[in-house]
Amino acid sequence: MQGNREMKRLFVGGLGQGISETDLQNQFGRFGEVSDVEIITRKDDQGNSQKVFAYVNIQITEADLKKCMSILNKTKWKGGTLQIQLAKESFLHRLAQEREDAKAKKEKSTTGNPTLLEKMGAVDFHMKAVPGTEVPGHKNWVVSKFGRVLPVLHLKNQQKHKIMKYDPSKYCHNIKKIPENLTETTPIAELTWELEGGNDPMSKKRRGEFSDFHIPPQKVKKVQKSNDPMESKVSNIGLRTNQVMEKNKSTHPVTAHGTAPSTVNPSKQLLVSSSGTQKPKHVVFHNSDFEIIWNKSSMSDDDVDSEDELKMMIAKEENREKPGHSSVNESEHDTFEVVRDDFKSNIHKLSSSVSLGNNHEYDSSDTDEIIAMKTKNAKVKNSAESSQPERTVSKKSSFQKIEPSNDCIKVQGINSNKESALCHGVKFVNPKFPPDSSGSDSEESEEDEEYKVLMENCPRVSLTLADLEQLAGSHRKFPGKDSETNGPQNDSHCKFDTTSKNPKTSGDLYNGRQQCILPEEIVASLLEDENTYSKQKSEEDILKPKFQAFKGIGCLYAKESVDKTLKENIAFNTGGGHHSSLKHEDHNRSLMENGSKCVNGSSSKLTSCQPAKKVNDPNHIQPPKRQCTFENQNHKVMSSTSCDKGSTNPLPGPLPLKAKTSLHLSANSHKVDSDGDACHWPESRKALEKERTNLSNLESLEKSSKVSPREDPQKSPAGFSLSDSNASCINAKDKQAEDNQKRLAALAAWQKAREVQKKLVHSALANLDGHPEDKKTHIVFASDNESETEETSTQEQSCPEKELMKESVSKSPGKLFDSSDDEDSDSKEDSTRFSIKPQFEGRAGQKLMDLQSQFGSDERFRMDSRFLESDSEDEKKELNEDKVNEDELAAEKKKTLNVVQSVLNINVNNPTNKGSVAAKKFKDIVHYDPTKHDHAIYERKQEDKEKESKATRKKKKEEAEKLPEVSQDMYYNIAADLKEIFQSMSNTDEKEEDVPRTEAGAREGTGKIRNAETLACEPEQTTGFTFSFFDSATKDEKDATYRIELVKHGKIVCPNDPRFQDSSSEEEDIAEEADHSKPSPGEAVPENEAIRFFFFSENDDRLRGSNLFWSGMGGSISRNSWEARTSSLLLECRKKHKEAKRKVKAN
């Protein structure tokens, strides 16, 4: 038994939860040797086990397997029913078996037939004999060297036609035998290339030997400047340092003459990104005291610049920048600089990045160069303006990445007196790169042209000296206001170039006329904390309009953006989502328009932009706001949109059943300070929370009221649930009582839901109508800075006419945010806002409304009651016409009814008058209530049917089977013999012989004419079936029941071959004959009267028409001629086709 065991793989299903491998081994170990057990548990999405089964590998005999299957299969064991069967073979086991079978088959095919070789005396084609001996029994087989048996071949000589005999035993003396165990196969993974070569770097790299990769240190040279900036000298150029500013670490560059190291704040660094492929070798930046030169050394150790080369390059830079130094030195201590009107700028790019590590467009570490600028105070947030002519050469790759800025002049606000005092201290000049070895001039010219094309759409702002002085002085008036305010500040208050990731100047402010002073660059680098700037960038990721807003359009943009932000707030709240920030196209458009230059009046005053300082109070969290300022000649509208980041109380949504809070609009919102905002927000949010809870309760109750008719019968105290098995046992009364209880429960639930719904609606409407005065429903937005409020107040005092205009604008319902001063007037307007005006009522009012809709909402064309037309004459005419039309219609209807009545002999008068017919009224569907006595009429009374006896049922069955009795009364006469009818018809009708339908016969048949007098003189005999609507009038004119008329055939003379009868002369003859053969109007067509049988007879009139479709014997002649003609036509067509082809080829 032990020897017959085989490895079997069993599937064991239906196992319980707590079964282990040892349990299965003990259970199946009785029948064989268990080698492996694999338990598999299938689980659902929640992790609950659904199915447990196992695979058991066991060495077992066939008998033991049958015994195991019969004993254990379908038995309950540890909470499960076992199911045992042979498992499917594992694919790995099957794959190994297939490989072994293929290997054995291959080996078997390579071995030859052993019996044949044994007969030859050779084993595997090897014989122990001297080379040259023939194999016995086999002709042309010879023993070669090493005992191999080879055939003698007859080969053809290549040079001669002679066939030579090739004996392999005579050419085998130089063969060497290679032992089989000499070749050692190495695995593929261990195979390597071995390339011979020297110790030069290329050979080492080919062999895969690379030296350790070291980043060469960046070299910082400090050149002390003399008093004259034109004669700056470089000393100690060989000084190199490895202390390089990296990311957010502050560094201490070593000075040339051992002076104290200058500390540089990492937040005040300026990053200049160059293009990826073209790297500047020398970048020179001018500061107030010294020049810093950064050298990017190459990656290889061999490429190191010598001191002589450095001196030559720096001398070139100094020669290039001599005219630049003079202009910088002259205006070094001024607050601002203005460029001469004859200057033409060709700046390609200046990209300065403040965010370190967050720059997505220029994040390559090997192309960024970090420049430290010396500042006198560590708290400087803003740096100076410079307008020095520069020229930079950039690659086209970086040039295409950077879009031109729409804001050509960027002015950053300065937050303190110290900042404004230090404004002139730092000057910055763009780097100048040395020209490359070849092709730099052509690239410069191409890029100049491309840049001019790109910068054509840039707006050109002309500034005067007075404007710039006023701009510089405006920052000194309000120092440190932003640091004192604790409320949410403006994160992006306007003139940022939002398409590029860093603020940059957009050059080429070239004006063709050059009549005004054009500042080429007024650069203000916003050097704030990188985190703050990156957050601002995420919020300012807004879209640009296609064209820049010009003067006077700011108000239109403001109105559009204000309306759209109101719509977006409502859509945001209906969705119920808690969004962190509003990022959509319309709001971005309004913010971007805020970023455009808004010109107030005729003066070109630029609004300064002040970056907001974030409140560092950890316990104080306020939502960031974005404030948009729109200026026009007449009025200024300020709006702000705020949303809570992650807050649980978003902006108000629409209230249920028209309970919506109206946002009162006013143009004076910029007067209100930020404290008003803090006051009104919590109150409005509490009211909104109440309304939202009411809305949710209402929705839940509506759902419950919809479900209650199905659920309540099951939840009723009686708890009736009828099944099909016992339904027949319950009598009708019990069933009716049960149905009544179900109806009562449904009624109670329905009434309860209706009452709750009414209460909710009532409370919502009460909150809407009786709103207390202290709780304002509208939102008041304050201005961010006190400086702005002061500016607007001074402007309002100086311009009372503008104030009056603002008040008139605020009354129109088109503006978004109003102040709290107009609350009373707005509440009155709300009551009369949706009431229909009296001049628009009635038919004339409808005409007035149509006339008003043509003008739209234009204030100049407001239609009132003065425009109403006098409708007396027109309406009277219309009424008279309607009455006349109705009278005519009634008379015509009466006339037609009389005609129908006289014809059909029936009374068609409408018996019912309009007054007698009761109008159909809609009555509410009565909900049956079993408790009310009035509703007893709706009940269907059940009558108990008595059981019929067998005798009565049998009697009814016999009555149903009886045939119905037919009365013997005769109501009509039946002609017993049909011969009388046919005889009377034969006497009256004249028999005519049918002529065969030929040409002559057809003409004769059509030529027969009978006069009307002879027809009238003929005696009339009754033909049996006659009927007339009018007895006396029509008795004299009785014709036969059926009249046979010959069909006139137009122009076809020969019906057999109509193809050959198509000449014009024949057609004219036929037309004349047909005209002669037409009977006159007073003549009648002769009648063909004959006895008509059911079956067709020979020469029957009814078969005459079908003769047209029969072809006679002459058809074969026409067919032959037609076939001959078609063949000749085909030949001619082919000939013409070939000629046309030849002409086409010749052309």
UniProtKB/Swiss-Prot annotation:
SMART domains: RRM. There is a cross-link at residues 225, 316, 1038 (Glycyl lysine isopeptide (Lys-Gly) (interchain with G-Cter in SUMO2)). GO terms for cellular component: nucleolus. It comes from the Eukaryota. GO terms for molecular function: RNA binding. Residues 383-400, 592-610, 629-650 have a biased composition (Polar residues). PROSITE patterns: RRM. Keywords: Coiled coil, Isopeptide bond, Nucleus, Phosphoprotein, RNA-binding, rRNA processing, Ubl conjugation. Residues 8-89 form the RRM domain. The modification Phosphoserine is found at residues 300, 306, 364-365, 416, 704, 783, 787, 819-820, 825, 827, 872, 1063-1065, 1080. Its main location: nucleus. The modification Phosphotyrosine is found at residue 362. Phosphorylated. CDD domains: RRM_NOL8. Residues 868-898, 937-963 form a coiled coil. Residues 441-450 have a biased composition (Acidic residues). InterPro entries: NOP8_RRM, Nucleotide-bd_a/b_plait_sf, RBD_domain_sf, RRM_dom. The modification Phosphothreonine is found at residues 367, 777. It is found in: Nucleus, Nucleolus. Interacts with the GTP form of RRAGA, RRAGC and RRAGD. Interacts with NIP7. Interacts with DDX18; the interaction is RNA-dependent. Interacts with DDX47; the interaction is RNA-dependent. Plays an essential role in the survival of diffuse-type gastric cancer cells. Acts as a nucleolar anchoring protein for DDX47. May be involved in regulation of gene expression at the post-transcriptional level or in ribosome biogenesis in cancer cells. This is Nucleolar protein 8. The gene is Nol8.
